[in-house]
A protein has these predicted regions:
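N-terminal structural segment of carbohydrate-active enzymes
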Residues: 14-148, 156-158, 163-166, 187, ...
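Aromatic- and acidic-residue-enriched segments that line the glycan-binding/catalytic groove
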Residues: 23, 44-48, 95-116, 155-249, ...
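Loop/turn elements at helix/coil->beta-strand transitions in domains of secreted/extracellular proteins
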Residues: 23-27, 80-87, 143-150, 291-296, ...
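Conserved, mostly hydrophobic/aromatic
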Residues: 30, 79, 89, 122, ...
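Short, solvent-exposed turn/loop segments enriched in Gly/Ser/Thr/Pro and often Arg
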Residues: 34, 85-97, 152-162, 300-305, ...
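The substrate-binding groove and active-site-proximal loops of carbohydrate-active enzymes
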Residues: 53-68, 116-131, 228-277, 294-303, ...
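Short, acidic/polar
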Residues: 66-78, 272-290, 413-418
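Active-site-proximal helices and loops of the catalytic beta/alpha 8
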Residues: 186-192, 197, 282-400, 411-412, ...
Length: 565
């Protein structure tokens, strides 16, 4: 038994010394509002309603998740127990106050910006998530655990103008009071009231967003008003003033919102000789400067001109350098990796995109990662991914099973799905609840069923076997960066080796107790090896190795340091 323990300690201690690499990162993507409610006192703000009487109607209201709740889970070790390297939180910026028509013109539920995709004010935190002090404590805690922090960045569009925002900031005449505007008015149509009219001029204004009367090409992704949202004029180099409604908003708030205003953004609330994109980039980069944010997932990448992404990347790298220099006592100040950028590019796979790499992207989200959990063919998919990693320096796949727009994975086979993901080359992104069996809600019956994919994390209904599996493989992955960044030799349909110099791991899928695993050419006879998932050891004999048992259709084999040959 002592030998087994020593072997395991040697393997994990040696691996733990290796530096973090984004190419092997395990990213935990969490919708803050749906994860954990740590403070019920911040659940209702800005005149919003949170309860319309049924689960279907409440599908897209704010549900109470916040920084305090996430901090509590971080302190419990929830993320470190899964080997998480990066926590990706949905955007923390203040969201539109009112609701948008759910399912578009159908309007079968009120749709709020709980998910962070509908920004109103980039200079302060949404009160539903928590305060600046609470966010700082969360980021600092994650950094102290060796975990990077990602947020979202969107240069394409602000949030929708809504009835409630129009009433509160007076940019359009609605005929409603604030209380009435917060009701779910089924007969109200965004398409008729805002999208085709010029009230946008009172929202962000003609200099900032494309107006319906300007004749833009709706078939051109760089000009289209995506899902009817106002579209920033990212091609414009014309100087603009900060939108009048924002100036009015800040004047109305005075110092009342100081607990939520990003200190590094306060100086950016003045008119400059800037284009719309310059304001946006400065506002977004200020979160890096203030909190040491380590990366961004950029939204709808192909809808924004590449030069703007390049400018954002440069601004964020400068801001991160400034933060590290200003916080020498913070463990994250010693990190040397550059600011990380990935993004959603519609239907992207693992293909290398040199223009985006030159703009500062290290990956684009891989929409085509297999989500069925079929372990009979995944080795060949892994081979293609590993070959791509080897061919393109600092570019790697960003793989996922589920995300906020898709629940494509076989939820009845998440053990094998988790194996396919967590042993894949490149980034492995776990969507909150993938590891626990988080269930859908009645919102799946709405026309816009996406809201059902974003259900609340139910901490009283955890699939313990599934969670244990994600934890085991996640920790193995974190301790062995070669899994994500190494080259691959495929031996057969179920067996491959990841290697980087002398660092080597053999992966065997669907192993059988009665069938020895062939390791000839990888581990010499007499080498003591450990199967990391079950922590069993064995000695290689006649080019083969056997273990008394296997669990969950996987074996991860590595040589013990004291007998490597």
């Amino acid at each position: 038994m002592t030998l087994f323990v020593l072997c395991g300690l040697q393997i994990f201690a040696a691996s733990a010394k290796k530096d973090f690499t984004w190419g092997n990162a395990t990213v935990y993507f969490v919708i803050t509002d749906r994860f954990c409610n740590g403070d019920t006192l911040n659940d209702i703000n800005y005149g919003r309603r949170v309860d319309y009487g049924s689960e279907r109607l409440n599908a897209a209201t704010f549900h109470g998740g916040d920084f305090k709740g996430m901090l509590a889970k971080a302190k419990e070790g929830y993320f470190t127990s899964m080997g998480i390297d990066v926590v990706w939180m949905t955007d923390v910026y203040e969201q539109i106050h009112g609701w948008m028509t759910g399912s578009g013109p159908v309007n079968d539920f009120p749709h709020y910006g709980y998910h962070g995709y509908y920004p109103l004010d980039y200079t302060q935190i949404d009160k539903n998530y928590g305060t600046v002090a609470e966010f700082r404590e969360l980021v600092d805690t994650l950094h102290a655990q060796g975990i990077r922090v990602m947020l979202g960045a969107n240069l394409n569009d602000p949030g929708y103008p809504t009835l409630l925002d129009a009433v509160q900031y007076g940019f359009a005449e609605t005929g409603y009071t604030a209380e009435e505007a917060a009701q779910h008015i089924r007969e109200w149509s965004y398409d008729k009231f805002f999208e085709k009219r010029l009230e946008w001029n009172g929202w962000y204004g003609r200099g900032w967003v494309r107006m319906p009367d300007e004749g833009w090409d709706e078939n051109n992704p760089l000009e289209a008003t995506l899902y009817g949202m106002p579209d920033f004029k990212d091609e414009s180099n014309e100087t603009v003033k900060i939108p009048a409604f924002l100036q009015r908003k800040w004047k109305m708030e005075g110092k009342k919102n100081d607990a939520w205003v990003n200190p590094s953004a306060r100086k950016l609330r003045k008119n400059r000789d800037w284009s719309p994109s310059q304001y946006l980039i400065a506002w977004i980069a200020s979160w890096v400067e203030e909190f040491g944010i380590d990366g961004f997932r950029c939204d709808i990448v192909e809808n924004v001109r590449i030069n703007r992404w390049q400018e954002l990347n440069a601004a964020c790298n400068a801001a991160l350098g400034k933060w590290r220099a200003a916080h020498p006592a913070d463990p994250a100040s010693a990190w040397t990796d550059k600011f990380y950028m990935t993004g959603d590019y519609d239907c992207a796979s693992i293909d290398y995109k040199p223009d985006y790499a030159a703009a500062g992207f290290s990956s684009l989200v891989n929409f085509y990662f297999p989500k069925h959990g079929d372990l009979d063919g995944i080795v060949y998919t892994w081979q293609a991914y590993a070959d791509s990693v080897a061919a393109h320096n600092n570019w790697h796949p960003f793989n996922y099973l589920n995300n906020s727009y898709h629940r494509d994975a076989d939820m009845d086979n998440m053990i094998d799905c988790g194996t396919a993901l967590l042993l894949s080359p490149g980034v492995a992104q776990v969507f909150y609840g993938d590891e626990t069996g988080r269930k859908l809600t009645e919102a799946r019956l709405n026309v816009d069923s996406d809201q059902a994919f974003r259900s609340d994390m139910d901490w009283n209904d955890i699939n313990k076997e599934q969670l244990a599996h994600f934890r085991k493989l996640g920790k193995i992955r974190r301790a062995n960066p070669v899994i994500g960044t190494g080259r691959q030799r495929t031996i057969d349909t179920h067996t491959c080796v990841r290697y980087d110099g002398s660092d080597k791991i053999l992966l065997r899928l669907l192993p059988n107790e009665w069938q020895p695993i062939t390791v000839a050419g990888e581990f010499a006879d007499g080498t003591k090896v450990m199967e990391l998932y079950t922590e069993q050891t064995a000695v290689v004999k006649d080019g083969k190795v056997s273990f008394p048992k296997y669990e969950h259709n996987v074996a991860v084999i590595k040589a013990c340091k004291d007998t490597e040959k």
